Structure formats: structure tokens, C-alpha cells
């Protein structure tokens, strides 16, 4: 079957033996004729599976168409050759493109495989690193959280400590502020003349000086090694202390004798003011007034004076028992004390002061100060007593009657009596218990008590009693101003008048208490004293002069055995008699009720009459002042 290639849409069919092929693949028709149909295959058209060009022509064999057909073939060949060349060139280009495409595909395929493996490894490594990094970050965060928790606990503890320190610091600041305020209120003077700080500094300086002086006096070698300069200084001090006393001696001559005799048997009581006069504070103590009370000291030996000073505190349990029993009369109280005390120490007990064991709470802060000041004042009292002792001895040389001297006491009195007298004379009185509310008047109350607590008995009347006792027997001592006077030598009488009838100096009132000066002076001059029933005592004395019995002592045994009813009534009346109410100054009216209540409730009198001693005991609560003066035979 002949091939029928198709070239550019034409189909040529070659039949017969006349068909020839040209060297270029073009068919050639036989000379004898060409067929009607020719098949030509374009050699430039590539086949799908072969690179050769087959041209088939179908030429119908005919005589008239041979030449024409040949010419057409040649023309076609000529026209087909450039096209064939173009097709070949396109084929080459397509082949090259196909090779390039295959190479690109291969390369792309290889590249994809390589990139995937590398990326996979890279991704795995990155994921592993990221997981490790995450774990490290988590561990680090946990460690930081733990450290933060520890730091938080430490911060809380430090904050608590800081809070406590702040509280302590605030407390310290408050305490410091209160201390500064207290010191400023204590030491800063509100007024030049009324300052607690100034008073305290003065008291401190005076206390130091008195303490040094007391140490010098109490030293054992003081009597042997005392310098002349010290003696001169003591003499100057005594002269300075008694300079105001000499001025008052001239003034006392104008005082009526009745007022002097009234002062001789009276004792001023320091009253306990009410708490309404509280908001003042002044603890100034007048040392000069304390020294005046000890001017009756009669001694020549320093050791004897040391033995004479005795301050015995009362037993607190005894006071509690007395309070449980209820109010006891002063005489019964004194009789119970006489039962407990031996007869040997009776005189010593009479002259011994009692210190109250139970003081008010407001006075506790000042108690040690008063006691120390009192102990320091004893030394000055010793010097004053020695000076007056020398003066008394000089007057005794000129006197013709018995005097209160150590020679007379050595001749007629036992040693116990002398020691008891010295103990009484040299013992300063205790300070009264005053609350802090009455500070501006404390020094004045003390000065009133310290100046007027004593008995200034007129010895000319005592001399008269002695003469009557020698003639008629030993009657009881007369305490009346109506006793007849005895002729005494002028020098003795003058000395006695100067000694015993001299009123004490008025207290130096501070500036804060000046409006009440007249009130205190009226207390001293007119209204303080004991109401003694003189008529009953005189009746009893007249009866005793007829019977001539010995003077009974007011102790438990003699009172029950020999005391008559008249004396008992007079003594009871004396015990129960209180002092006259005071006519207070108008500016001091608000404190009147306190003085009255104090006098009505707390003051009781005990009278102990003996042939040698007259004891006046003032009992206020648990504070008893016992005093005595010798009655010479």
C-alpha cells in the first residue's frame, strides 16, 4: 500500500513505475505521463516518530499533463525549500527548549528534595532549641519566684521590726517631751521670786552645806582636832542667826505680860488645809526657824549630844491595831504606852518624838527630803545649844537660885533624866504631813509649828511652888497665871525673861503667801493655845496642901490608886478641850473649814503632871509630839 503523506493540507498519491525520488526526497514523474493524483510529503514537516521526509505524489498518467505537472512540482519544490529550512530551524529550537525544560525539571526536582531535608533538620533543631530555651526560661522564672518569696518574707520581717522601732522611737520621743516639759516646769522660773527650780537649787546647796557640817561634827576626832577657823565661823553663824532675836527682845518689852504668859502655856498646831488650795508648789524650808527651836540645848560634850538625838518611828502595826479598835481617849492611849514602856526608859520615851509611819501618798515624794533636812539641821542645833550653854553657865555664876544648868542636874537628877532632857532639847520636831495641794503654805505651817511647839514656863512661879512645897509638902505644880511671884535676883530674872518669854520670830512668808501674813500672825499672837481648867486645878491644889500627899504621876498605877475625882474631871476636860477657832483673813476664808475640821477631829491633848516634868502630848492621827520641862525642887 503506497504512502500518502500530507503536506500543508495536500495529499498526493504516487502510482506507477514512473515515480522517482529526487535526491532531496521530492518525487519525480516519469516521462511517459503523470497521474491525476499525486501525493507529496513535505520533507520539512517533522513526524512524530521519524526524522526522514517522505513525499508521495499521485500523478495521473496522461499525455497532456506531463510537462505541466513537472513544472508544478519544481515550483512547489522551490517554494517548499525555504519552508523546509524554517521548519528544521524550529525543530532544532523546540528540541533545545525540550532539553532545557527537562534539565530545569530535573534541577527543580533535585532542589525541592534537598531543601526539604535541610529545612526538616533545621526545623527539628530549631524546635529542640526552642523547647530547651522554654524549659530554661521556666526554671529561671521558678528560681526567681522562690527568691522573690524569700525576699518578700524578709521584707515583711524587716517591716515589722521597723514598725516596732518606730513605736519605740515615738514612745521615747513622748517620754523625752514629757521629761522636758516637767524639767521646764520645775526649773524654769515663772516668777523671779516664786520658782520651784530656784527653791530646789537653794535647798540642794543648803543641804550639801549642812551635810558637810554634820559630817564634821560627827567625826570622832572633831573634838580634838577642831581648828580655830571653824570655831570662828561657828561663832559668826550663831551671831548671824540670833541677830533677829536681839531685835525682837526690844520689841517684846512692849508686849503685855498676859500675852507672854499665854504664849508660855500654849502650843500652836499646824493645820491640815483642804485640798482646794492645791495648785501651788513651794517646798522652801526655813532653816533659821528650825535652829531657833533647839536653843535650849544644855551640853558641854559632843558625844553626849550625839546620844541625845533620837528619832524613833512608831510601829506601824500598833497604829493599825489602834485604828481597828476605834477612837481611844488620849489619856487611855498614854496609859497603855506607860504599861508597855519600862520605868527606866519612861523619861526617854516622854522626850522622844514619833514619826508617823503612814503618810499620805501626795507627801511620799517629799518625806525623804524633810527627813534628810531634819538630820542636817541637828548639827546646827548642836552649835546653837553649845553657845547658849556657855551663856547659861556665865549667868549661873551670878545667880543665887537654882538654874537649869548641868551642875544642878548632875547634883539632883540621875543620868537617865539628863539624857532624856538632852534628847528632848536636841531633837527637832517632825514635819507635819501635808498634801501637795498646800505647797505654798507648807513652809509657813512648819515655821509656826517649829517656833511655837515648846513650853516657856516662868521660873519665878516655879520657885514659888518650890518654897511652898518645902513649907507645906510637895503639891502639884500650879499652871495658873495667878500664882504669886517670888523675889528673884534682877540678873537672873532678866536672863530668864530674855530666855523663856521671848516670842519666836514671825515666819518669813514667801511672795505667793503674803496676803495671808496677818492671818498667821493672829494665829501666833492671839488664837493658838490650850484651854486649861485653872479653877479645878487650884481647888485640887488646895486640897492637896491640906493633906500634903506626893504629887501623883499620871501613869496607870498612880491614877487608879491616888487620883481624886476633881483632878480626873479637870484632866478629862483638858483632854477634850480644843483650841479656839481662828479669825481668818478675808482672803483666806475658803480654807477656814479645813482648819476647823482639822482642829475638831485630829487634835487631842494629854496632860502628864509630875513633880519634875510637865508633858504636853499632841496626838494628831499617828503623830505625837512629847515635850517636857523640869520642875526643880
Curated annotation (Swiss-Prot):
GO terms under cellular component: cytoplasm
Basic and acidic residues composition bias: residue spans: 316-326
Biased composition (Acidic residues): 335-350
Keyword Coiled coil: yes
SMART domains per record: DUF1220
Keywords: Coiled coil, Cytoplasm, Repeat
Expression tissues: Expressed in testis and fetal heart, as well as in non small cell lung carcinoma and neuroblastoma cell line.
Pfam families listed in its UniProt record: Olduvai
Domain of life: Eukaryota
Residue ranges of domain Olduvai in the record: 221-313, 314-402, 405-460, 461-552, 555-633
Positions in coiled-coil regions: 127-186
Intracellular or extracellular location(s): Cytoplasm
Region (Disordered), start-end ranges: 15-52, 316-370, 463-484
More details: Encoded by one of the numerous copies of NBPF genes clustered in the p36, p12 and q21 region of the chromosome 1.
Family to which the UniProt record says this protein belongs: Belongs to the NBPF family.
Protein name: NBPF family member NBPF3
